[in-house]
Amino acid sequence: TVYNPDIIAVHTTCLSETIGDDLTSIISKADEEGLIPEGKKVIYCNTPSYVGSHITGYSNQVTALVKFFSKSTSRRRNVINLINGWMEPSDQREIKRLAKLMEIRTIMFPDMTDSLDTPLTGKYNMYPRGGTTQEDLVATGDSKFSIGIGHDCTENACVKLDEKCHVKYDVVDVPIGLKATDR
């Protein structure tokens, strides 16, 4: 097999939304029929092209991460979730650096700092190292607090995490410029 991911993310398109594809039923049936390989996780969300923009689709998929992974053991950990909006990997890296300087333990998701911002080595790597681990995604439900970075992309995920696991949150602007960075 060429591809062997641990997580398969499925989303709709304008056409599949128009004809009424029911992702919940389709994926449940595939699971019941044994079509999803053992140990693989399939997450999904609706991303209709005619509702909102690419930001809406991104927000829906980030919210799906919470829906399918976050769990609470009722044991709060001294960790802050950093839920990223539409940001460059270099911006994410800087936010992680600042949190580390302040000695704040974080779980950043999605975290594209190492998987999308990699050097050109001349070797093809289908699955670059990095990103948020499944274990960390599950642990977001036990975090002390969440900070959503970018209202349009993260507010729904923050709300979902609070509803599901009672993790309080604040949603802030993307820290571009002095005013937003100081906030």
Q: What is the meaning of each model-derived region?
A:
Residues 1-183:
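An N-terminal assembly and electron-transfer interface module characteristic of large anaerobic redox
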